Amino acid sequence: MNSEMLKQWYKKHNIEQRSINGFWTYLDNWRKEDEDFDFDYGEMDSRLIELDVHKIQFTHLFDYDDFIDVILRIYYNEEHIGSYKSVYTLDGEDEDDILKFEDNRFIKILVETTNNSIEIAEKALKEGIPNQVVEKITGLKSSLIADIKCKIS
């Protein structure tokens, strides 16, 4: 399979959206099933999770069916925290998936720090401090600041 065929396959089977949906399903199920998730990784705010397609790869293993891997990079508040791999058959059927976070101590600190920034942003916006100033103080994205402002208004 050449790269053009792989790109056509990717578009034909709506793989990007299916992989993104698969990530959210996996994460939601993990959060529900693992009572220690928030303790291990902190209370993640889904608004701060971003996904980026990193790789699409055709794989041929002898004595096994060919398959295609799609790797999504996971970012939390613009910091890389892990990857999500979804595996598909050549017919475009879901085969398997796995979510892998990097060092959970780093993620927990990042999540807690970000949550503190969100609390500061909420308080600052309630006091009438302009969005741009809150963005500079907290390091949060302008879209999140606007979302917080709508929530508290």
What are these regions (language model features)?
Residues 24-27, 97, 122, 126-129:
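Charged, amphipathic alpha-helical interaction segments
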Residues 81-113:
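A short, surface-exposed interaction/processing loop segment used at functional sites
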Residues 1-39:
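N-terminal trafficking/processing presequences and adjacent post-cleavage segments
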Residues 42-86:
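Exposed beta-strand-loop-beta-strand "reactive/processing" segments of non-cytosolic proteins
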Residues 114-153:
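Elongated, amphipathic alpha-helical interaction scaffolds
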Residues 2-4, 110, 150-153:
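Short acidic DE-rich linear segments
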Residues 53-59, 112-119:
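Short, positively charged, low-complexity/disordered linker segments
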